[in-house]
Structure formats: structure tokens, C-alpha cells
């Protein structure tokens, strides 16, 4: 990204911390998990450069995106394009994209098989939550649409095929060993398998946030599950920036069988990646300008 005068604004890795976990990923696999990015291509470049430079220490390498690549930030389409080729860039044998609540809103609006009223409701929610920044990247409005129905039609026609195809690859969760990767978390009061089986395309009007893996915050973030963890798993998630607290502690999270990789990229200029090998995890933080700083630099 370029500031006035041609100076390039770069993101860089500014912190590395290593922890021992109460659960482990599969013994033959090293897992690179990347948290919420929200249209910050610069932060993703920094994280992928770091990942590409990591010496392989296991037979297999997997890359997991925890969701919310889109909305709010300056370059959601660029972030998706970068993510599509990220596995090859870091030498991964497998790449997994998880669906965040922002991708859920986007896909519900753009899925032609969705009931029209449900799609319009999803579109309204998506636009209220930063989706307009994405739409402006692939729709050139010579004339403003007459209403939401026309707007939805225009967006569906203009959506690039590669973006639609990427949306359709996203899944609800992924597991390696006794570590569960999911966008928002789980509900400790609900059977784990039943909770994770909730359909992604549940109409937004019917979604109860505490009962959906793309939306849950409470009671998950305040849970202390004990030595059994969450259904036997440690949970790696994003969705709630820094646990909605000013100074979150990964040590405290790990004691409660979870790790939060949402660093609040738009407001903080930070994004996180965790590298899992066995029961060890290395958490890396990339720092760039905030969205507000980028807006001032570009305009």
C-alpha cells in the first residue's frame, strides 16, 4: 500500500511467542492458522512471507484460514485472491478455508438458491457490517440501483466467478489431532457435534448467536471447561477481537482450552498466525497501519 509521496507502507512481524498446549495436533502435521484479516492484504502478505520461511518439521503442512477475510478493510478481493494461492506459496499440502460470520452474510446474500427474502435480509446485514467496501471493488455503479432488489441482482451478476468459487469451498470447521479450528467458537452447554452440525445457511433471522459456530461469543469466551476441554478439544478461533478486552493473555486462554487469533486488524493494524507442531504453538503478530491511517494516506 502506498502513501502520498510514493512511500510504501509495509506490514511486518513484530512479536513471536511460544506456548505449550494441553492438546496436540496430529503428530505428522504442522498447522499454520491465520486469524481474521478483514480486507488487509498487507497483513496477509507479512504472515505468508513468515510462513514460507519456516523450515518444514513434519511430513505434512496444512494452512487454515479461520474466516472473516472480507469486509471493513480496503482490499477484500485482493485478500481473497492472495488467500486462494496461499497454500502453494508456503508449500502446504492442504489448505482449509473456514467460513466466518462475514462470509456467511456474503454467501447468503449471493447464493442464488437462497429464498429471495432471506437473501435480501442477508444483504442488508452484510452491507451494515462492512460489505459495501467489498461490493465497490467489483461493481461500478454508473447509476445507483433503485432499491435493494435491484442492488442484489446487480451484485449477483457482477460477482467474479473466482470469488463465488472460493465462497463455495469454505467449511464450518476442521480438526487435527485434538485441536478444533472454527471461526467463532463453541457453546460449552451444547453437545459439540450437534453444535458444529448447525447449517451454515441458516437464515439470519433464525440465528441465535450463542447457538452458531460462526457467531458465538458467550458463554464460550467466559468458559473454564476443566481438564476435558471442549468435548476433548482445544479450540482455535477468531471472531471476537482480543476477547473484547484491552489486554488479553494467551496463557489464560490456553488454560481454558482455546486460542483467539482475532487481533482486530482494522482498528489495531494487527493480525495473528499460529504455528502448531504437536503440543507446541508459536503465535506470531503482524503489524501494519490501522484502517484509519490507510484512509488518511490514500486521500
Residue ranges and their predicted role:
Residues 28, 58-61, 92-94, 177, ...:
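A general structural motif
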Residues 2-82:
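N-terminal active-site segment of His-dependent metallophosphoesterases
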Residues 142-259, 264-269:
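Acidic, His/Gly-enriched loop-helix segments that form or flank divalent-metal centers
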Residues 36, 68, 83, 100-101, ...:
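Divalent metal-coordination and catalytic microenvironments
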Residues 73-171:
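Active-site neighborhood of divalent metal-dependent phosphoester bond hydrolases
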Residues 254, 258-299:
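Binuclear metal-dependent phosphoesterase catalytic core
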Residues 31-33, 63-65, 97-98, 180, ...:
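Residue-level marker for buried hydrophobic side chains located in beta-strands
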Residues 39-42, 71-74, 102-107, 188, ...:
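Active-site environment of divalent metal-dependent phosphoester hydrolases
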Amino acid at each position: 500500500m502506498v502513501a502520498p509521496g510514493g512511500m510504501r507502507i509495509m506490514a511486518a512481524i513484530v512479536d513471536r511467542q511460544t506456548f505449550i498446549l494441553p492438546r496436540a495436533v496430529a503428530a505428522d502435521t504442522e498447522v499454520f492458522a491465520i486469524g481474521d484479516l478483514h480486507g488487509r492484504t498487507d497483513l496477509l502478505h507479512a504472515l505468508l512471507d513468515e510462513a514460507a520461511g519456516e523450515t518444514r518439521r513434519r511430513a505434512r503442512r496444512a494452512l487454515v484460514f479461520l474466516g472473516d477475510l472480507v469486509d471493513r478493510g480496503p482490499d477484500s478481493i485482493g485478500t481473497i485472491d492472495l488467500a486462494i494461492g496461499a497454500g502453494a506459496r508456503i508449500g502446504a499440502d492442504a489448505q482449509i478455508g473456514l467460513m466466518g460470520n462475514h462470509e456467511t452474510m456474503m454467501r447468503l446474500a449471493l447464493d442464488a438458491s437462497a429464498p429471495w427474502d432471506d437473501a435480501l435480509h442477508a444483504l442488508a446485514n452484510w452491507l451494515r457490517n462492512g460489505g459495501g467496501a467489498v461490493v465497490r471493488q467489483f461493481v461500478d455503479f454508473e447509476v445507483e440501483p433503485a432499491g435493494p432488489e435491484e442492488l442484489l441482482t446487480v451484485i449477483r451478476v457482477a460477482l467474479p466467478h473466482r470469488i463465488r468459487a472460493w465462497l463455495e469451498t469454505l467449511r464450518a470447521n476442521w480438526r487435527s489431532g485434538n485441536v478444533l479450528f472454527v471461526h467463532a467458537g463453541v457453546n460449552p452447554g451444547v453437545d459439540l457435534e450437534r453444535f458444529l452440525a448447525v447449517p451454515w445457511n441458516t437464515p439470519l433471522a433464525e440465528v441465535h448467536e450463542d447457538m452458531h459456530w460462526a457467531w458465538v461469543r458467550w458463554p464460550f469466551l467466559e468458559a473454564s471447561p476443566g481438564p476435558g476441554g471442549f468435548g476433548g478439544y482445544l479450540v482455535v478461533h477468531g471472531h471476537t477481537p482480543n476477547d473484547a478486552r484491552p489486554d488479553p493473555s494467551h496463557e489464560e486462554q490456553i488454560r481454558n482450552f482455546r486460542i483467539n487469533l482475532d487481533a482486530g486488524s482494522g482498528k489495531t493494524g494487527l493480525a495473528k498466525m499460529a504455528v502448531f507442531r504437536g503440543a507446541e504453538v508459536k503465535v506470531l503478530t503482524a503489524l501494519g497501519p490501522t484502517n484509519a491511517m490507510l484512509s488518511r494516506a490514500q486521500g
